[in-house]
Amino acid sequence: MDAVQELERRIVELEIQTALQEDVISGLNAMVAELRQTLDLQQAQLRLLYQKMQDRNPDAQEPYSLRDEIPPHY
């Protein structure tokens, strides 16, 4: 009878571990989905900013440089 109880205890422990892992996986999936939305939004914003910079000076022969934006006191 001792061996049966030990097996039952081990099965219960495995079930608990599985339930905890499923909870962690569910939380990670939610976080990945949220981060994907954030990334999509940031990519859209970056495309918009790039387009605005191109529209600002479409005839420029050289690419846009951040040095052009440095205030004069630097």
Swiss-Prot record:
Pfam families given in the database record: SlyX (PF04102)
Lineage top rank: taxon: Bacteria
Annotated region (Disordered), positions in chain: 54-74
Protein family per UniProt: Belongs to the SlyX family.
Protein name: Protein SlyX homolog
Organism: Neisseria gonorrhoeae (strain ATCC 700825 / FA 1090)
Name of encoding gene: slyX
